Amino acid sequence: MTGAPPLVIVNPVAGGGRARRFWQQSAIACREADMKVDVVQTERRGDAANLAADAGDRLVISVGGDGTAHEVINGLLRRPAGRVPRFGALMYGTGSDLVRTLPSPRRPKDVPSWLEKDRWRRIDVGRLGSSTGRRYFVNAADVGIGAEIVRRAAVGPLVLGGTINFLGAAVVSLMVHRNSSVRIRADDGFVEEARVRTIAIANGSHLGAGMRIAPDARPDDGLFDVVIIGDFGRFEAIRHLPRLYQGTHVSLKKVRVLRARRLEVDATDPVGIETDGEPAGATPAVFEVVPAALDVLVW
């Protein structure tokens, strides 16, 4: 790679310390390959975004989970307009859904060749306007039960692993969460008022540590895949939960999929939102595609 060395932002607590240990081994591989990188560890929430915002035009690599990547991307995209930001992710967090859409090395010894190959994919990002202001997301957002699942998974035992942790949080949330009455407006004129379990606004294909929520989503087609999961009862939803991991839920009668560049969601009572596995306020909300916003280093 030419120019300034990449800035590597490591979240040392992501994945119960797995991200830190992965980078320690990767750093050894980079030194052995005579590859220079600048490394900094985060200490508190918000550090990753601030470091990325101040990184200039060089490649910024996130080492952590989806939440760390989410912060880095928001930092990159708040810089003044100019060159398209360059981003890479080494995923070792609780959920790590982004890597299912945008693969990166899983072995430390492969990190130097990943950097050396210099292969890029230009992708879209999502922009959310909600009760907490504006933020960007790269993988997916969720209006409804997803915010509850994220909250429960965040306090779950990491020793179980991301998928089991999120699955347990999903089952508990399904038992206590009440469906919401919402109004949905898409840019093609589609308008619907309905009771829903959740609405996924997907740029990537997965969320919730492996749920294949939008099987056909592509992060570079200029469109969200919007998956509306309707008025499922508690036990009905639990019975169909395995289909979310298989991606076959989209054939159910109470599930609707549409594609849109812009989506407005309002509700009778405020409904929680999560973006890339992070709490993101509540409805009313507007989601917009920002096309070709990010260059991602791919494996």
Q: PLM features: what roles do these ranges have?
A:
Residues 10, 24, 33, 40-42, ...:
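Catalytic core of DAGKc-family lipid kinases
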Residues 157-165, 207-209, 215-236:
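Gly/Ser/Thr-rich active-site loops/lids in small-molecule metabolic enzymes
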Residues 68-80:
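Short Gly/Thr/Asp-enriched flexible loops that form oxyanion-binding sites at enzyme active sites
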Residues 186-188, 193, 218-219, 228-299:
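ATP/nucleoside-binding phosphotransfer catalytic cores, i.e., glycine-rich phosphate-binding loops
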